[in-house]
UniProtKB/Swiss-Prot annotation:
Protein name: Homoserine O-succinyltransferase
EC number(s) given by UniProt: 2.3.1.46
Protein family according to the UniProt entry: Belongs to the MetA family.
Biological process according to GO: L-methionine biosynthetic process from homoserine via O-succinyl-L-homoserine and cystathionine
Intracellular or extracellular location(s): Cytoplasm
Marked site (Important for acyl-CoA specificity) residue numbers: 111
Originating organism: Cronobacter sakazakii (strain ATCC BAA-894) (Enterobacter sakazakii)
Keyword Cytoplasm: yes
Protein's job: Transfers a succinyl group from succinyl-CoA to L-homoserine, forming succinyl-L-homoserine.
Chain residues that bind substrate: 163, 192, 249
Length: 309
């Protein structure tokens, strides 16, 4: 889907350099079709980088996707210019009376922070409660998965003693699931998290369908039977160099991190890594848009009355 974004958004030029089809609002306005309305709650500190990554994954299909960016943290950002936030982001109050076809909630570097100590935890709870009645399908990524499992299912925070970082192999567990349609039986995906997602825990606490997991028994991809919510515990949106940037940042901070697993050629941080997960990342988001959003959302969003009860 060509993504529909404001003409001045920096991602437009960035993605066009990669030959990614981005449709500006001015061009999209002359097409007489209803675009899918997708809201992205961006919790990452480097918001522009994260925008580029998610918009890239949402761009590869023939229908329009109208993107709106949401922020819920009113504190001054150290990583994103205030002008960018003011120009391209909305607050919850701006959209709380609207309905959306899809919602994506990104990860956040909060793996070692207790939920009640997260500055915007009440706002996260508010958005998830709102989404039950106002969004057709919501996709949670990495830390947002842990937050959603706690809010929606009461699952306690599970934290690993050591951060998992690297590119790990996973296998699909339901061969005919729509969200993994077109996937290889085994595939790679990057992870960067302290959160722990044992598949057994998900099965014990919920009726969610686990669609893919790691060889170590960690759930990677799972979803509700009604397609209203989906969870991906890794970072399929990451660029080839994102894990490297995190690793060298931690090295410079004196944290002595482990070299990301299965990432640098010959496990040598001086060598340039390559993205080995890109095709499955694209498939995941394309499948979510098609089967979890487009196929079940109403044409007239005013008539939507979904429920997770």
């Amino acid at each position: 889907m060509p993504i529909r974004v404001p003409d001045e958004l920096p991602a437009v030029n960035f993605l066009r350099q990669e030959n990614v089809f981005v449709m500006t609002t001015s061009r999209a306005s002359v097409q007489e079709i209803r675009p899918l309305k997708v809201l992205i709650l961006n919790l990452m500190p480097k918001k522009i980088e994260t925008e580029n990554q998610f918009l890239r994954l949402l761009s590869n299909s023939p229908l329009q996707v109208d993107i709106r960016l949401l922020r819920i943290d009113s504190r001054e950002s150290r990583n994103t210019p205030a002008e960018h936030l003011n120009n391209f982001y909305c607050n919850f109050e701006d959209i709380c009376d609207e309905n959306y076809d899809g919602l994506i909630v990104t990860g956040a570097p909060l793996g070692l922070v207790e939920f009640n100590d997260v500055a915007y935890w009440p706002q996260i709870q508010q958005v998830l409660e709102w989404a039950k009645e106002h969004v057709t399908s919501t996709l949670f990524v990495c830390w947002a998965v842990q937050a959603a499992l706690n809010i929606l299912y009461g699952i306690p925070k599970q934290t690993r003693q050591e951060k998992i970082s690297g590119v790990y192999e996973h296998h699909i567990t339901q061969p005919h699931a729509l969200l993994t349609k077109g996937f290889d039986d085994t595939f790679l995906a990057p992870h960067s998290r302290y959160a722990d997602f044992p598949a057994a825990l998900i099965r014990d606490y919920t009726d969610l369908d686990i669609l893919a997991e790691s060889e170590e028994g960690d759930a990677y991809l799972f979803a509700s039977k009604d397609k209203r919510i989906a969870f991906v515990t890794g970072h399929p949106e990451y660029d080839a160099l994102t894990l490297a940037g995190e690793y060298f940042r931690d090295v410079e901070a004196g944290l002595a991190p482990r070299v990301p697993y299965n990432y640098f050629p010959n496990n040598d941080p001086t060598k340039t890594p390559r993205a080995t997960w890109r095709s499955h990342g694209n498939l995941l988001f394309t499948n979510w848009l098609n089967y979890y959003v487009y196929q079940i959302t109403p044409y007239d969003l005013r008539h939507m009355n979904p429920t997770l009860e």
